[in-house]
């Protein structure tokens, strides 16, 4: 469990660093008064979407690595492909949690950390969108 927690925290830190860098880039791409408001918001939103998709890649890689270390497996799939890991990470990070693929053993710890990470990053994104739209209205 300590190994899984350490991996989960490492993935959280990598994801947070990536997402904050992408938010800074989105702010540079969408400063007030430089381009039409809708274009700025669209460009910034695309970068934020890319950030969330890359965070899913980070966690998918972490899930695959942790599974290869024997920290658990995924039920409902005889063998996980790269797409399965990405799909599971994306569903987990967005906190949708469909349940068609689910982790066993210590991978559940990493899954919980992935969900918390996604919730935190979605909150950061909501703040970015709110501030961007608020600047456009003023």
Question: Which functions belong to the PLM regions below?
Answer:
Residues 19-23, 55-59, 63, 122-126:
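Alpha-helical transmembrane segments of polytopic integral membrane proteins
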Residues 54-86:
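Outer-pore turret/helix-boundary of cation channels
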Residues 10-15, 83-137:
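Pore domain of cation channels
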Residues 28-40, 69-73, 138:
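Membrane interface segments of multi-pass transport proteins and intramembrane proteases
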Residues 42-56:
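Interfacial helix-start motif at the membrane-water boundary
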Residues 7-29:
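N-terminal signal-anchor/start-transfer transmembrane helix
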């Amino acid at each position: 469990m300590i190994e899984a927690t350490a991996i989960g925290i490492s993935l959280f830190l990598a994801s947070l660093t990536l997402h904050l860098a992408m938010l800074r880039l989105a702010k540079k791409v969408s400063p007030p008064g430089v381009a039409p408001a809708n274009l700025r918001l669209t460009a910034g939103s695309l970068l934020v979407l890319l950030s969330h998709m890359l965070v899913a890649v980070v966690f998918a890689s972490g899930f695959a690595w942790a599974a290869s270390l024997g920290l658990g497996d995924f039920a409902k799939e005889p063998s996980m492909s790269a797409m399965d890991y990405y799909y599971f990470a994306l569903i987990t990070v967005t906190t949708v949690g469909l349940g068609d693929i689910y982790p066993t053993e210590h991978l559940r710890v990493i899954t919980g950390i992935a969900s918390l990470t996604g919730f935190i990053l979605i909150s950061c994104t909501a703040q970015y969108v709110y501030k961007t739209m608020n600047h456009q209205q003023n």
